[in-house]
A protein has these predicted regions:
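An N-cap/entry alpha-helix motif that binds or orients negatively charged groups
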Residues: 1-72, 178-237
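Hydrophobic faces of well-ordered beta-strands that scaffold small-molecule active sites
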Residues: 79-82, 109-111, 130-134, 158, ...
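Conserved, mostly hydrophobic/aromatic
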Residues: 24, 81, 102, 160, ...
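Glycine-rich active-site/cofactor-binding loop and its immediate structural neighborhood
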Residues: 76-114
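Glycine-enriched alpha-helix->loop->beta-strand junction motifs that scaffold or abut catalytic
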Residues: 106-108, 125-130, 154-156, 248-251, ...
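Glycine-rich beta-to-alpha transition loops that act as phosphate-gripper elements at the mouths
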Residues: 113-116, 137, 236, 254-261
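Glycine-rich phosphate-binding active-site loops on the catalytic face of alpha/beta enzymes
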Residues: 163-164, 274-288
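Conserved small/polar residues in nucleotide/adenosyl-binding loops
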Residues: 296-298
Length: 298
């Protein structure tokens, strides 16, 4: 990050405050909200704040490195960009911008099945840093084709999301009138108008669409694609399903959204190479344990 930006935004909290004033209210509520009363979301934050370190000192000459090797590939840091659906609502062209940033910084970038750009565009932009997140399709042929497209587009790792058997209730999003497709009316226009940079970029790029899925829909519109997502993705994941996915994908396979040690162990036994210990950012089950506390046991 350029020095002037580091001076203006030295912390993540500074970036969050800036983002909140740069994008419309409904986009912020989509990005920032959890499910229900947001207790799981808050537990995540509170538990992370309680994690502390006991440093070892007097270790001689300093030669620190944040590099880590994972699945035979070296990354610049042990962090990555997690999958986020509907990225284009937060900022037009966000999927490609994130992929390019990941390529520049040599960290993983995970494209969501319900991202707003096609894998054929985002994969090359990630330059080998791309992973593809799969919401499990019910249809075998759809599943096989999405996996094929991810491989053909240069994604190295497949991430199967396990913790979305059905859509969750996100009350802040309902209050903010977050809809797919958006219902364009006076309130939405007023909120967009006071965020001119976002509005201008959206006018240039068009409203966000689930572009990866439009290939399977005749005369695709956002309404049709949203209906397709509800009818075809999720609700079917089982250990047998995961085993079938393992047979379709030659590269590293990750299962995302596990909190139970027994599930994590079984995922590895079923053929997964790794798991992501996650409660979906507190966006699925409000009564779930904080992710970092499950990591201790897994």
């Amino acid at each position: 990050m350029p020095t002037d930006l580091m001076d203006r935004y030295p912390s993540v909290d500074d970036l969050r405050r800036r983002a909140r004033w740069r994008i419309p209210h409904f986009a912020w509520e989509y990005l920032d909200s959890g499910t229900g009363a947001e207790q799981a979301r808050d537990r995540n934050i509170d538990a992370l704040r309680e994690i502390t370190f006991v440093p070892r000192l007097l270790q001689g000459e300093l030669n620190p490195s944040t590099e880590v090797e994972l699945f035979g590939q070296t990354y610049a840091a042990p962090i990555g960009i997690a999958p986020v659906g509907l990225v284009g609502l937060t900022w037009p062209g966000g999927d490609v911008a994130l992929a390019k940033a990941a390529a520049e910084k040599r960290i993983p970038y995970v494209l969501s099945t319900v991202g707003t750009e096609k894998p054929e565009v985002t994969g090359p932009a990630a330059q080998g840093m791309g992973w593809f997140q799969l919401y499990p399709p019910r249809d075998h042929d759809l599943r096989a084709d999405l996996i094929r497209r991810a491989a053909d587009s240069g994604f190295t790792t497949l991430v199967v999301t396990a913790d979305v058997p059905t859509a969750s209730r996100r009350e802040r999003q309902r209050k903010a009138k977050v809809r797919v497709p958006p219902k364009i009316g006076p309130a939405l226009i007023a909120r967009a108008a006071v965020r001119p940079a976002w509005s201008i970029e959206t006018l240039r790029a068009g409203l966000p669409r689930f572009k990866a899925l439009e290939a399977y829909i005749d005369q695709a519109t956002m309404a049709k694609t949203a209906g397709f997502v509800g009818a075809n993705l999720g609700g079917t994941l089982s250990w047998e399903y995961l085993e079938a996915v393992r047979g379709m994908w030659d590269g590293p396979l990750v299962v995302k959204g596990l909190l139970n040690p027994d599930d994590a162990e079984r995922a590895i036994d079923t053929g997964a190479d790794a798991v992501v210990v996650s409660n979906h950012g507190g966006r699925q089950l409000d009564g779930s344990v904080a992710s970092i506390l499950s990591l201790i046991h897994i």
